[in-house]
From Swiss-Prot:
UniProt GO cellular component terms: cytoplasm
Pathways per UniProt: Porphyrin-containing compound metabolism; protoporphyrin-IX biosynthesis; coproporphyrinogen-III from 5-aminolevulinate: step 2/4
Record-given protein name: Porphobilinogen deaminase
GO molecular function: hydroxymethylbilane synthase activity
Amino acid sequence: MTAQKIRIATRHSPLAMWQANFIKSELLKYHPNLIVELLPMKTKGDIILDTPLAKVGGKGLFVKELEVAILEGRADIAVHSIKDVPVDFPEGLGLTTICKREDPHDAFVSNHYKQLDELPEGAIVGTCSLRRQCQILALRPDIIIKNLRGNVNTRLRKLDEGEYDAIILAAAGLMRLEMQHRITSLIAPEVSLPAVGQGAVGIECRLDDEQTITLLKPLEDPETRIRITAERAMNLKLQGGCQVPIGSFAILENEQLFLRGLVGSVDGKQIIRKEITGHQNDAQQLGITLAEQLLACGAEEILAEVYKNQ
């Protein structure tokens, strides 16, 4: 009998490779005889590094090439940071597995200052995220936001070389790369609401590939699935991409889901925050309802302005 094989499409960055190898080790833990191959590749978002992400344009900057590999039969699954995954999938593909979420916070990283509040007037902060930018500027309009691209090591090197007074990164990425010592402080969600799906790893697969989906089942985390379902439902209703100032974060306790949402202008002068609570079985509807509340308060106009300037 021929051993089963799974081919994993992944980005080539150190963090993406860590995530793919993590999925490989998890699969082998549950299926010791499985053959698992990695297929590293570069995406559009990896190649175009001299332009802010919001200006590159299009959805799926970090996933499209991986999806093509699945559709063409070169790969069976793709491993993603869920915050990079668009709300719409190519026909026949879906997020069939969502793994247990790591820390979803944004991390403040600096060699000289302990937190955002301590930065001097006119300090230079590095990020490529409009979501982080709008929330930082809402708190500290005096701060200068400077675009920051590249993998985690590249971004840290730029900080260490003095290009920035501080940079903002996803805490989960630093933890996965065993660089938690570089986290100066975690930023509270009240200050910087995380991105939709931040800290969670998802697996994309052909929806008709029942054999592969069955192999992936032990990697599914039901609690994370509920939380991500609510966050992504909000984002879908808002028609938000990965490069827009939208934040969402769900907490699940005793079957009660607490969902926060945010839409802001790029300059931080307008920020709409809403929250909603309900039963976990209504995760999708809670996300939709929260988005409708945000839209009723002017989110549509803010997002239209963002898209117009991209």
